[in-house]
Structures are given as C-alpha cells and as structure tokens.
Amino acid sequence: VPRDADERRAENQPRVGDDHRNGAPVTPEIFADTFGFRGVQFGNYVEGDRRQSDLNESFDALMDLAAVLGVPPRALSLNGRLGLAFGARGKGGKNAPVAHYEPGTVVINLTKGSGPGSLAHEWWHAADNYFARDFGAGGFATDGVKLDGMRDAMQARFKEVRSATQALPLRRRAAALDKRRSKPYWNTPIELSARAFESYVIAKLKDQGAANDYLANVVDEQVWNITEAARAEFFGGESAETYPYPGQAELPAVRTAFDE
C-alpha cells in the first residue's frame, strides 16, 4: 500500500466484537499454535508494550477475519507458508509503503506508523498469490494467470472477483488516480480486488455488529471527496472522482463476488 493518498483514517477506532482472548494478553506460543504462520518477526523498535499490543490486536483481527470467511484460524497461514512481520522489513523514506506483502518471501509486513489497518488488504494479496503459486503459474490469481489443476469452482470464484471489480465504477476512479503516477497501481486487477476485499470484510463485520480497524481501516468516501476538492482548489483544475474503494452502491456486487 504506497502512500499516494490518505486512504485510511489517521487513527484506528477501538475494536468491537467477541472477546477472542478471554480478556488476557495472547502469548507468542498461543499465537503460533492458533494460526500456524511460518514465522512471526518483530523489528527492533517493536519492544515491550508495543510488541504485546501488536500481538493482541493482530490476534483479534485474524480471528475476526477467519469468522468473516468461515474458515478455521489456521487456514489464514495458507498451509503454514505465510510469514508475518511487524516493522521488521520496511525500507522507510518518503512514500514508503505503510504495509506490504512480499511474494518472493511470502511475508506480510505491517510497518510501525500505519501498518495496522492494512492487514485484510495484505492478507488478500497473500491469498491471491498463494493460489497462483500453488497451481504453477506464479503471480496473482486475480491478474488472470492460468491456474492449471485448480478446482473449477475455485477458478470460477477468482474470475468472478476479477470480473466484478473490473465492472465497478471504482475502476474509473482508480484510473483517475493513476494519472498522477508514472505507472498503473490503483487500476490494476490485483489492487482493485484487494480494496474490494477490504470493503467486503468491513461490511461483513458490520453485519455482525462488529468492527476492527486493525484489520481494515478505510477513509469515509465523503471525507475523501472533501479532501480531493481541497486538493484540486490548491493545485488548480477540476476535482475528479477518485475514491479508491467501492462506494455503498457498489457493495452488493462486491458481496456477491466474495460470498459465492
């Protein structure tokens, strides 16, 4: 997730949902046993209270994600191939990613400043890449790669996600954002599907009367549009529609694509 725009709210709101830890801090052993990640890495800055906080919040977020998807928690580690890092693999500097997934090493890194809020986004990238790798193609399944040997039902699901996100007005808004970049990013099947997945997760949690900003924190469309209007006034020119997530009218199509 590169820092092209403030697509996340500045602060995460308190989580709302079931108590997955019985009110107690989670230990590294319980975390490892619950999810089965290949490894969990912390950067040098992540010490003491911050390390425990990251463990607790990521534990709750992953449990919430498993509930949304209807899968066992250990399934989120993608057969134990996925690794998780907290502020351990970022490069820093201007416009550095706030969080990223590394397909070469199969690791999600959540950075110190703004990584929390991006977990659902980066997990989708990992799953998208996992299924493409698992069936010999490499790359990402939503990028249209050939998936030899994958069950027809699973192939159809990825095609539906790709088709649905490509058909949304979101794609036009993403293309407008990409005009500010030297190469496409927002308007790529990989990114469109990841942002649609975030909105899907938020909507499914809302159905349960729950919310988890550590898992997915997305700026409100109205706030984004106000900021964009101010940007256009400052730099000159017209304010384009650029909201990088599905709007309320687009959510039914997103739900259908991910629910099937």
Please provide the spans of the model-predicted regions.
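Active-site-flanking segments in enzyme catalytic domains
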Residues: 2-56, 71-260
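Extended, Lys/Arg-enriched charged tracts that mediate electrostatic binding to polyanionic substrates
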Residues: 62
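Divalent metal-coordination and catalytic microenvironments
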Residues: 65
